[in-house]
Swiss-Prot record:
The keyword Metal-binding appears for this protein: no
Official protein name in the record: Tegument protein UL23
Keyword field: Host cytoplasm, Host-virus interaction, Inhibition of host innate immune response by virus, Inhibition of host interferon signaling pathway by virus, Inhibition of host STAT1 by virus, Interferon antiviral system evasion, Viral immunoevasion, Virion, Virion tegument
Function: Plays a role in the inhibition of host innate immune response by disrupting the interaction between NMI and STAT1. In turn, NMI-mediated transcription of interferon-gamma stimulated genes is inhibited.
Origin superkingdom: Viruses
Designated gene of the protein: UL23
Lineage, highest ranks first: Viruses, Duplodnaviria, Heunggongvirae, Peploviricota, Herviviricetes
InterPro entries linked: US22-like (IPR003360)
CC terms in the record's Gene Ontology section: host cell cytoplasm; viral tegument
Length: 284
């Protein structure tokens, strides 16, 4: 493992590798531990960047604890490489000055930087398991109702699913329990407030989290994102229904995603990888 680390750091002009090691070359593919269908392509990117230094500085500003970043390579599916690209821009891997690894991802509504590992060694051991928005079909629950929910491709399909399963209890992948609602339980003004707060053209209620401590409503917007709302706040829970089914409310407890746009940052509650309670500074 130490030889691999030396090669990795040599790629980033940190150290000179020992003579017995073979440094990774630009364009070389490094298979990921998870997910198995993707690899790291060293020093290759599929988006236009005019100034690499300024772009890395811009991405670092997304973090709650900014640090200098260095571009490592792109995360590509083997299918993407086989067909020589598609309309989706591959995610990019960055190395922080602290040794932490981050993943840049381009979403429909914003880009983001996600904390993926504390070190190069951890990244090589776990891959992208800390990226909650990355899901694989094998993680889907076996219940037909949740598989049908994950398969909804647009907001109208979701509304039909809700009508089919209204009133039922659903156990998500993190074992959180959701009660599916009907739209009649909500005032038009409440739904419109949600729509304005998340900046979407259309939102639909999903239900509420079964909890003895607070009333937490859940709704879906026309980008198929899932949000949680109480009397005071709205925050994003999942970037897709697939993520919501497999991860449930995980982002409320462990969230390493940092969005780039101001509107999404207001709707996101990240967990500092260094254990700093930034909420204390925000309230000061």
């Amino acid at each position: 493992m130490s030889v691999i680390k030396d090669c990795f750091l040599n790629l980033l002009d940190r150290w000179r590798p020992p003579k017995t090691s073979r440094p990774w070359k630009p364009g070389q593919r490094v298979a990921l531990v998870w997910p198995k269908d993707r690899c790291l392509v060293i020093r290759r990117r599929w988006r236009l960047v005019r100034d690499e230094g300024r772009d890395a500085q811009r991405l670092a500003s997304y973090l709650c604890c900014p640090e200098p970043l260095r571009f490592v390579g792109s995360i590509c599916t083997y299918n993407f490489l086989k067909h020589k690209g598609d309309h989706n821009v591959p995610s990019e891997l960055y190395l922080g000055a602290s040794g932490a690894m981050y993943l840049w991802t381009d979403h429909i509504y914003s880009d983001s930087l996600t904390f993926v590992a504390e070190s190069i060694t951890e990244f090589l051991n776990i891959g992208l398991r800390r990226c909650n928005f990355i899901t694989v079909p094998e993680e889907l629950p076996h219940t037909a109702s949740l598989r049908a929910l994950a398969g909804c491709m647009h907001i109208h399909a979701f509304a039909q699913w809700r009508a089919t399963y209204r009133g039922r209890l659903m156990v998500m992948g993190d074992y959180s329990v959701i009660r599916v609602s009907t739209i009649r339980l909500y005032d038009w003004s409440e739904i419109n407030d949600w729509r304005v707060m998340v900046g979407s053209n259309h939102v639909e209620p999903l239900g509420w989290l079964v909890s003895p401590y607070d009333v937490i409503n859940l709704f879906v917007d026309d980008c198929m994102r899932v949000f949680a709302a109480n009397n005071q706040h709205v925050c994003i829970v999942a970037d897709s229904l697939m993520e919501f089914v497999t991860r449930g409310m995980t982002r409320c407890h462990e969230n390493g995603i940092y969005y780039g746009t101001r509107s999404m940052r207001k709707l996101n509650k990240p967990t500092c990888p260094y254990g700093v309670d930034h909420q204390l500074f925000d309230d000061a």
